[in-house]
Every structure is written in structure tokens, then in C-alpha cells.
């Protein structure tokens, strides 16, 4: 039987792609973990949409792209020359593809110009939750990204995509100013 654990991280370090170990609480593992959480949150969103739908395909692509992003984050700067665009390093084409999805979907409806109360539908609420997890991953990645890396712009566009998808899925928006208050 294959062991599914190594125990090598019991000392508080983690191994990186192409070699090397760093403390688990350092910038690279923290950012990689945040992106891993974002990928899982997007996966929950995928589980709520129709298989093979346009939304499912876009979310699947994002999950695939996040593996690339995590590979880049899990590589020491000395090994960045070993990374390959689109496979282990975020490429300009990956960022452009997400931008195209945002633009295409954004043209199909009038986006609200004010704050929206999340939760009109379960899927829209989950997309909003995934968006906030991606935003946190973006903040974590800022401190870990190499100069010139495209991973922060990718995460920024991905959060925009999730926002647009949530608004598209919910259809009718509940604007925060329209919520009745007792005061």
C-alpha cells in the first residue's frame, strides 16, 4: 500500500518545486495555501452548476490555472528559470483569457453600479464567497510573487470574473440601499 504522507513536514517546513525547503509559515506556503483554499471554494461553486455548462467550463479552467499559479508560488526564486509559461508559471495569455471571459459575460447584462447584498441564489452566494477567498489569496500572493510575475494580476482578474459570474447567475440584484432598515 502506498503511504499518503511523508512526515517530512513534521519539523515545520515544506518542500518546494524543484527543491528546497522553507518554513510553513513563510510567504510562499502561506500564499500557496490561500490559493489552494480559493481553488477549493471555486470547486464548491462548480458543484452547484450544471456540468458542461459555460459556467462549469470557465470555473474548471480557473481551477486548472490555479494549479499553474501554485506551482509558481511553490518555487524558490533561484529556480524560476525552470518554470514554463502556462504550465508552471502564469502567462500573459492566461491573464488575457480571464479578461476575455469577464468582458464577454459583462456584455450580457447591466452590472449593478452599487453594492449588492449576496445570497440571491445558492450558486451566486458561493461565487461571491469564492471571490472573497481569491481576494485574500491575492493579498497573500503580493508578498510572495517574484518581480514581473503575472500571478497577482491573474488573481485580480479572477476575482472580477467571479463577481461578474455571481451577478449574471443571480439575475435580479438586491442592492444594499434597497434593504429596509428600522432606523
Over which residues does each language-model region extend?
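Phosphate/pyrophosphate-binding loop motifs in nucleotide- or prenyl diphosphate-using proteins
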Residues: 1-183
Amino acid at each position: 500500500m502506498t503511504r499518503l504522507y511523508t512526515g517530512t513536514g513534521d519539523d515545520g517546513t515544506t518542500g518546494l518545486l524543484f527543491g528546497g525547503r522553507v518554513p510553513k509559515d513563510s510567504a510562499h506556503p502561506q500564499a500557496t495555501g490561500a490559493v489552494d483554499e480559493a481553488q477549493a471554494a471555486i470547486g464548491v461553486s462548480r458543484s452547484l452548476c450544471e456540468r458542461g455548462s459555460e459556467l462549469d467550463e470557465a470555473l474548471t479552467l480557473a481551477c486548472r490555472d490555479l494549479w499553474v499559479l501554485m506551482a509558481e508560488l511553490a518555487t524558490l526564486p533561484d529556480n524560476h528559470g525552470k518554470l514554463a509559461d502556462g504550465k508552471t508559471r502564469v502567462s500573459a495569455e492566461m491573464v488575457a483569457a480571464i479578461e476575455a471571459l469577464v468582458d464577454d459575460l459583462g456584455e450580457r447584462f447591466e452590472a449593478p453600479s452599487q453594492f449588492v447584498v449576496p445570497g440571491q441564489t445558492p450558486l451566486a452566494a458561493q461565487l461571491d464567497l469564492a471571490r472573497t477567498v481569491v481576494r485574500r489569496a491575492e493579498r497573500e500572493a503580493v508578498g510572495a510573487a517574484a518581480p514581473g510575475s503575472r500571478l497577482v494580476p491573474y488573481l485580480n482578474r479572477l476575482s472580477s470574473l467571479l463577481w461578474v459570474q455571481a451577478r449574471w447567475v443571480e439575475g435580479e440584484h438586491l442592492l444594499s440601499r434597497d434593504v429596509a432598515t428600522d432606523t
